[in-house]
């Protein structure tokens, strides 16, 4: 079996009358991994969107309403749960080998008959920001990438989030001092030379889950390399935007993605 190949798919209750949802089991580096697929009901060829969730395990799990919301903007959306979740095989390792589940998710979208294979975008929220950037670096035919409240520097996350240190040491194999190479491997700002697509950074200035310093470091490095980058910074917002602004940002970011032309 090839990465991105669907093993099993069944209908999942959709919160939107215009979107079909499917629970998917797909192939990723020899593992059966789960995810959620959202497909607009209307016939046509759509842009694809790989939605990369934040958190780990049950924290930050993919929400059907969120996926349907993006699909309603005119995308076929696939959201991997990452290995080891919801009955999937393997174990998450926080942007280590589980990044392959995102890579395979990109291939899954390419195989979908309702997706334009040249118009696949990558969206990451929180920890998903790392996954999105690593996937865009790996998949050089990605049309664009969005990092919303996204982690970009894993060592900075270790420094800032004392509440996550125990988990990070367990899944990564130690602290940044003990295994610096593991943190560097998981930090996309060290690997942006190979990024080809435009980047949109969305971040709240009062974010205490993922500080805006992550966004600043990403922006700085992209500009040093002459990459295309757009920033939408909101000084008074935290990690979670107010509901009305959140909805507006979904629509605006989707429009931004559609406006990007793969050069």
Residue ranges and their predicted role:
Residues 44-46, 51-90, 155:
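Short substrate-entry loop that stabilizes the transition state in hydrolases
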Residues 208-214:
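Conserved alpha/beta-hydrolase "acid-adjacent" motif
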């Amino acid at each position: 079996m090839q990465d991105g190949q669907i093993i099993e798919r069944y209908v999942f209750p959709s919160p939107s009358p215009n979107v079909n949802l499917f629970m998917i089991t797909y192939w990723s580096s020899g593992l059966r991994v789960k995810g959620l697929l959202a497909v607009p009901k209307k016939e046509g060829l759509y842009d694809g969107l790989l939605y990369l969730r934040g958190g780990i395990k049950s924290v930050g799990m993919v929400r059907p309403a969120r996926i349907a919301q993006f699909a309603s903007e005119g995308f076929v959306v696939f959201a991997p749960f990452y290995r080891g979740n919801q009955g999937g095989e393997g174990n998450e390792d926080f942007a280590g080998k589980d990044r392959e589940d995102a890579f395979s998710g990109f291939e899954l979208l390419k195989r979908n008959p309702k997706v334009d294979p040249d118009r696949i975008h990558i969206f990451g929220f929180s920890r998903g920001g790392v996954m999105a950037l690593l996937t865009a670096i790996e998949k050089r035919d990605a049309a664009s990438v969005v990092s919303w409240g996204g982690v970009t520097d894993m060592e900075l996350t270790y420094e800032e989030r004392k509440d996550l240190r125990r988990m990070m040491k367990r899944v990564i194999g130690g602290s940044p001092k003990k295994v610096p190479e593991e943190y560097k491997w998981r930090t996309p700002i060290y690997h942006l030379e190979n990024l080809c697509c435009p980047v949109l950074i969305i971040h709240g200035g009062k974010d205490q889950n993922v500080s805006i310093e992550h966004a600043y470091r990403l922006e700085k490095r992209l500009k040093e390399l002459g990459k295309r980058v757009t920033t939408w910074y909101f000084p008074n917002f935290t990690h979670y935007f107010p509901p009305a602004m959140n909805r507006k940002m979904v629509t605006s970011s989707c429009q931004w993605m559609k406006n990007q032309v793969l050069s």
